[in-house]
Amino acid sequence: MDLKSLIRDIPDFPKPGILFRDITTLLQNPDGLRYVIDQFTEDYREQSIDYVVGIESRGFIFGAPLAYQLGAGFVPVRKPGKLPAAIHAQEYELEYGTDRLEIHQDACPAGSRVLVVDDLLATGGTAAATAQLLAPLNCTLVGFGFIIELTGLAGRQKLPDCHINALVEY
């Protein structure tokens, strides 16, 4: 399936000079959405995944149904202040400042096999912060699954020891 045909380009969003890759049109297409989940399921079916970790917020959209298909649990990585129990937190750099991601301390038992899913790999900051969040849990990071990778932003370089699967590259 040609996923690029289901992803809308929005020039100058969220600011001038940015070409935004809008996945809402992919989400609206039942065949496209099914294809994404089925493709990731096929790619990871034999990997004995225990937990799919979805990064807020679009990682939730793909991560929960993928976890279901793989017979795995789903774990959300959230923005600050959204998780009610004890957390691990990781700050990461933005273009102008920093942000933080959080995960419950008991999200994945030690030794669990974990797959991280999100919609987009751009600079790699969010993905790298998520990998760092998982480290104190002593789980095995099997890899990352992304719908889109913006190759010109070199996000893979921040994940040098991780398997990365991107369904679409720009």
Swiss-Prot record:
Its main location: cytoplasm. One of its GO terms (cellular component) is cytoplasm. It is found in: Cytoplasm. Belongs to the purine/pyrimidine phosphoribosyltransferase family. It comes from Acaryochloris marina (strain MBIC 11017). GO terms for biological process: adenine salvage; AMP salvage; purine ribonucleoside salvage. Catalyzes a salvage reaction resulting in the formation of AMP, that is energically less costly than de novo synthesis. This is Adenine phosphoribosyltransferase. Homodimer. Keywords: Cytoplasm, Glycosyltransferase, Purine salvage, Transferase. PANTHER family: ADENINE PHOSPHORIBOSYLTRANSFERASE (PTHR32315:SF3). Pathway: Purine metabolism; AMP biosynthesis via salvage pathway; AMP from adenine: step 1/1. It comes from the Bacteria. InterPro entries: Ade_phspho_trans, PRibTrfase_dom, PRTase-like, UPRTase/APRTase.
